[in-house]
Curated annotation (Swiss-Prot):
It comes from Streptococcus pneumoniae (strain 70585). The keyword Ligase applies. Its EC number is 6.1.1.11. Homodimer. The tRNA molecule binds across the dimer. Consists of two distinct domains, a catalytic core and a N-terminal extension that is involved in tRNA binding. This is Serine--tRNA ligase.
Amino acid sequence: MLDIKRIRTDFEAVAEKLATRGVDAAVLNEMKEIDAKRRNILVKVETLKAERNTVSAEIAQAKRNKENTDDKIAAMQNLSAEVKALDAELAEIDAKLTEFTTTLPNIPADSVPVGADEDDNVEVRRWGTPREFDFEPKAHWDLGEDLGILDWERGGKVTGARFLFYKGLGARLERAIYNFMLDEHGKEGYTEVITPYIVNHDSMFGTGQYPKFKEDTFELSDTNFVLIPTAEVPLANYYRDEILDGKDLPIYFTAMSPSFRSEAGSAGRDTRGLIRLHQFHKVEMVKFAKPEESYEELEKMTANAENILQKLNLPYRVVALSTGDMGFSAAKTYDLEVWIPAQNNYREISSCSNTEDFQARRAQIRYRDEADGKVKLLHTLNGSGLAVGRTVAAILENYQNEDGSVTIPEALRPYMGGAEVIKP
């Protein structure tokens, strides 16, 4: 959520920044006018209340003097009616301002590339060289079906489109991947957490999914509960409405969880395979940091995600997202894109973002600065470390052999009982 004080005092700069995210200047101008009206009304209310207090004191004195107070009582009643009317108007204005501040995206950091969409993203670096096959590589969905480890047909029968069963070594591979990821993140100082997979609406608001992106979620009918779209939601809300001790920062959390997404607006995109599902596993990283340290922590988090890909020997690239492609809550985002041979393309497998104080303001997560004793908003960061299903897809395609078998990456073999190959 944006700071109304920053918008008020640095309006032109904020408007310029948000314009790069597609926010119409007219929206901000309306917000500015409403905020000015609110402050004017507040001045009027305080003036009227002061007058009312004066009249009240005069009435009390008149009664002590046995004087007639009818006129003063009428005047006080008029003042009270004016205050009541202005308070009602203030409530309407506050609701409108809340709507503005909760539906506007975060202000992009100065280092974010300016652009309209993903075509304006900037590649930062690459790691690894895509493998050259001496045979036509298969898509991971064909490999999975031929190996008998991925079953979309029965997933569709049991549930519907974009659902599947993992079987045998496919299920073992999925489990090996997320256990490996959690172990690696643990080495980097992350505390492993098992979160609730259902959260309330306040939690969804805290991380920015609600109210703007309600259609992308699975709500439990007639309840205050939602299936989590990512473990970021419960992890980032862990300290909601709390004040932390500054000396304890930064704090690192990691969790593996299922993620549930309706994929509204994704009809026709990635209809086959593991890239876009309604339910998938993901290992998430979340950090709570002091503002002056948060961008250093973003670089570390991105490196933590890269470490997984490097140890799995999967070629990837790091991309800085443009202002027009970043997520709603992010001030800066790096995407990690892994090489998918059958698509001859890099596909997103992780997003690592610094939301600065955007989520912390919504969730009221603060810390007491040990230097000056003041209570301040901290910065929150989140990143995929990694999307597990997409990692399965990348391994199947990059490690496939001409006979249809798939070699298991060395880093995962200890998690698979020493198995080296998945054979038809």
